[in-house]
């Protein structure tokens, strides 16, 4: 049976892809059959007339997985916007059944799967007759989550709102990771302390350098549960 964890965040561009790549890379370095999946990606880049899932490409390159990144994303859109708007712009219906089927295939390929979300935890994936929110995907795939937050001023509010939303939706939170953490910044240091105290969760930090991430292999393995 495969194991998985879902990487969500307090918003866009706080480091979900970087953290996903870091986890997959560390597992791969230990000889573990680890892989990646993302249900919907917007902001795909056109290269030689073909759209490329850049987030997936980054993760696969960083973790040295020599595969086509597009094979690990169910829906890829060119418009850099929320998936629901990108799908509407390209007249595409996003189906939960495809996401589930694609994830089943990924599970058969890898022993450990890191699943990256889109935007923040309250992200509309598809608005239509059968609307899909990001939380619906997390529940459907039966995954625990890691919340990635920025370390800057204001992160206490955004992080705790994300924590409370997940709890209200009965989603299990494995940990919080503060990204772009500066161990010499008094605000960053206090943010970690306060978030840990308020959330009662384990709070890890990652700096701009991979070596500055304080997450051990044992901790990483504990993030993943049977799926």
Swiss-Prot record:
Catalyzes a mechanistically unusual reaction, the ATP-dependent insertion of CO2 between the N7 and N8 nitrogen atoms of 7,8-diaminopelargonic acid (DAPA, also called 7,8-diammoniononanoate) to form a ureido ring. Gene3D superfamilies: P-loop containing nucleotide triphosphate hydrolases (3.40.50.300). Its cofactor is Mg(2+). The keyword NAD does not apply. Its main location: cytoplasm. Pfam families: AAA_26. Keywords: ATP-binding, Biotin biosynthesis, Cytoplasm, Ligase, Magnesium, Metal-binding, Nucleotide-binding. Pathway: Cofactor biosynthesis; biotin biosynthesis; biotin from 7,8-diaminononanoate: step 1/2. One of its GO terms (molecular function) is ATP binding. InterPro entries: DTB_synth_BioD, P-loop_NTPase. This is ATP-dependent dethiobiotin synthetase BioD. It comes from the Bacteria. GO terms for cellular component: cytosol. The active site is at residue 38. Belongs to the dethiobiotin synthetase family. It is an enzyme of class 6 (ligase). It comes from Clostridium tetani (strain Massachusetts / E88). The keyword Cytoplasm applies. GO terms for biological process: biotin biosynthetic process. Mg(2+) binds at residues 17, 55, 116.
């Amino acid at each position: 049976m495969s194991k998985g964890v879902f990487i969500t965040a307090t918003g866009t561009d706080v480091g979900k892809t970087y953290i996903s790549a870091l986890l997959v890379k560390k597992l791969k370095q230990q000889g573990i059959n680890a892989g990646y999946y993302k249900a919907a990606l917007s902001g795909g880049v056109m290269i030689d007339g073909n759209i490329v899932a850049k987030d997936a490409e980054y993760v696969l390159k960083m973790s040295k997985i020599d595969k086509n990144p597009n094979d690990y994303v169910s829906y890829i859109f060119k418009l850099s916007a929320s998936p629901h708007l990108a799908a509407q712009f390209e007249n595409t219906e996003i189906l939960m059944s495809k996401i589930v089927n694609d994830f089943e295939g990924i599970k058969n390929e890898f022993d450990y799967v890191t699943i990256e979300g889109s935007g923040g935890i309250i992200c509309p994936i598809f608005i239509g007759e059968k609307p899909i929110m990001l939380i619906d995907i997390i529940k459907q795939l039966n995954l625990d989550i890691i919340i990635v937050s920025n370390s800057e001023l204001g992160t206490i509010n955004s992080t705790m709102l994300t924590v409370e939303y997940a709890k209200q939706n009965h989603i299990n939170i494995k940990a919080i990771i503060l990204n772009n953490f500066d161990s010499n910044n008094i605000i960053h240091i206090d943010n970690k302390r306060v978030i840990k105290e308020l959330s009662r969760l384990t709070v890890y930090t990652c700096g701009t350098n991979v070596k500055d991430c304080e997450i051990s292999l044992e901790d990483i393995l504990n993030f993943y549960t049977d799926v």
